[in-house]
Amino acid sequence: MNYDKNNIFAKILRGEIPCKKIYEDEYVLAFHDINPQKKIHALVIPKGEYVNLDDFSSKATEKEIAGLIKGIGIVAKKLGVSQVGYRSLVNVGENGGQEVPHLHFHIFGGEKVGKMVS
């Protein structure tokens, strides 16, 4: 699958669509989900053009990989969920439920999130 430069997250990264920003650095942008599934629901996306986790893990630099993982931790702390717990989730491809073709990690928290898969 090729990267689509017109996906909604690419437009957010370019500033064409606004977001409720939580955190940003040279590697990631984090913002609140516009349709939250839990009390706290944030998205953390890499700034590079990566379709999904497979694409990212095979093409990203070590700095980008470390930056994304560190960014998720920073966002969890900023949201106040790092001590009480949260779920980080990434969907990959159609069968995995991925809706936007730009790698993104969900952070769910602020309440018990329930079973992983029913």
Where are these regions (language model features)?
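HIT superfamily nucleotide-processing domains
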Residues: M1-S118
